[in-house]
């Protein structure tokens, strides 16, 4: 590998803006904001959705049923 062409990989704190949840992860993203997390200072990256607020992970998922061709056929001929 060539030297000095890759971005610096370092620990950063990601913060979910909708819930305030923070977690530490490695990333190449940069930020001017910093935050103290577990006694250390890290760059802060704000995200809109994380596993703490996404409906798939929280279990508050809404299921919508789209009527397809088979459903319309069954409804039309009273099969179901």
UniProtKB/Swiss-Prot annotation:
One of its GO terms (molecular function) is structural constituent of ribosome. Keywords: Ribonucleoprotein, Ribosomal protein. InterPro entries: Ribosomal_bL28/bL31-like_sf, Ribosomal_bL31, Ribosomal_bL31_B, Ribosomal_bL31_sf. The gene is rpmE2. This is Large ribosomal subunit protein bL31B. Induction: Part of the SMU_1296-SMU_1298 operon. SUPFAM superfamilies: L28p-like. HAMAP family: Ribosomal_bL31_2.
């Amino acid at each position: 590998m060539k030297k000095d062409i890759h971005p610096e990989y370092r620990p950063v704190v990601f913060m979910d803006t909708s819930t305030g949840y923070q977690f530490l992860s490695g990333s190449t993203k940069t930020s001017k904001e910093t935050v103290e997390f577990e006694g250390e200072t890290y760059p802060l990256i704000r995200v809109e959705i994380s596993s703490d607020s996404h409906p798939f992970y929280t279990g508050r998922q809404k299921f919508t049923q789209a009527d397809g061709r088979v459903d319309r056929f069954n409804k039309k001929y009273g099969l179901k």
